[in-house]
């Protein structure tokens, strides 16, 4: 019988092992982190009188892994306090601890024999029903456990996390012929629900799915680089321009990614594939390019050695980044690529449409894409059914493991399956069986959309199969395709989620808030009065909300439409107050960037169900403003409600914290940190898997209905501290200005903020005021700042550069 996964052991505290343990801790799963006992005591430990018998020495490697994770940037932990969930130890003294664990993850060095020796010891200590897996990226899963007990092999499989585990969605689950189906199901479900992973079932083939396809594409691209490259020899800058966002890939593109990962890591992966794929039709490609060999010899390994394809040198405010010249092997100044087709394609927002347009270009950009994408399509199609039985797994692996916007087959559909096949026929290139079967069955695409459902072409049946969405996943585009959209305007929609729950969805550019959003919020509130039991505020874009529409605000300011500015702020305030005191529960479901007005909406919702990766902050000071849709008010209300009630207690410390968080535009690095910053309350909850966020928020709303939700009434008992608090905050601004931490205009903005937080700065003693009183102060400060030239400059700079101006 399988054990419920409540405690996990990670064997190996290297980069991956430690970070897997950290992510388990992020998910509130107690984890053991074990590693070997060091063979020697370094001089610094000897100086402390330590020997190999001391626990500090024996656990040093595991502790070092944990400490490195605590220091890593971007942060591995949601909050540092989660480290308490991890217990460190060593294999010699503490391996027996695994008897209390439900899942044991082996993550030691990539050596089959080392893994086998450790696992042979572990198998005698396992609790009945415990699951054991390996995080190997390339060794055969079955071969590692060959000859082990049958009970062990039935509970044995591969679980390949991608680095860094917190941020990379992909978890490849690789069963063997012996693995029990219920073990695969248990690990997949746990990875999905508890760890927030996108699960891809892979076959036990070399490097599984993502690294097999990803390495092929990388090597194909490397073959185009330098003076000896195919198709004319592209520079490093050209290739990174072509294989970044223009292609729907991450900004780090090809060479920056290799610098981050490590050139030596690429070499290890390629050598493994070269040795493991004697019959691969493109085995000729799985070889180390000569310039990579030269880089290894010169220790140009990327970030770990301070130089790789790029090298940062001192100079100027931020230093200068040089590029390796693959001909001279000297570093030179970066050169701007001259690719006119690429510049023109930047105006096309959709990545698939952009790639389609670039493929048709007769210029170098078009030549590059025709070669690289044509090879990728051909190779991926030939990997079915070798590495996977379906195209969806390959597409998801590339999207979740390599951060591609679209999968290989999704891109192929966009370009045209038949069009590519016709080109191959002209080149006398064999058509892969998958594409041949698709086209001979009179079908034109690998995916089919109809009635809100997605279907994919299945090689085995030669027909489309429905792409099943697991329980607990709601797709808003699917609901809209099935006519569940109740109302719509250019900025927002109201959607019926079923079971009496409506959804207010933003869909303006970057989900910024404008009049359309406010109007639809009122429509949602009206729907609550006309039959719906609850409302979720959520969407499934890249980010929840980046704040108010600054362009509309700037136009109103420049045209002197002050009544319009007043009215826009008042309307947003009124909408948020209506949400806060709605007759039925309103649940916000933020994720990703949730800034400014997006935070204010969350603050006024009955509950928040946030994705674990939610980056919340009231950032208005960055554009010379303060939060004025109730955000400043609500943060003050929460602070004062949390203030100690003891006689003589001074609540200013809590007001000061709000002042600093808003005044410094602090943005959380996770939903858990957002709770510590006060943007989320103790009542709010978190979803590890963003795919489940809308469904989780809907269930939370229904739970509130079931519990007999009752709205409160607008407050008139909020304590403000008056002149003493105002003076303290102004003193803080003065000291920060003297220390040159802030500018003169930061002091101006901060003073307006301090005035609101102190209740207007006029009361000589603490007073009780209403929410409306504070809202009026917010609005007055906001409009006053809009009339300042330096605020206008900040808004213009943000719109042009996408980052704040400190003037």
Walk through the language-model features, giving the residues of each.
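N-terminal glycine-rich phosphate-binding loop for ADP-containing cofactors
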Residues: 1-535, 539-542, 551-571, 575-584, ...
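Extended, composition-driven regions rather than compact fold-specific motifs
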Residues: 546-548
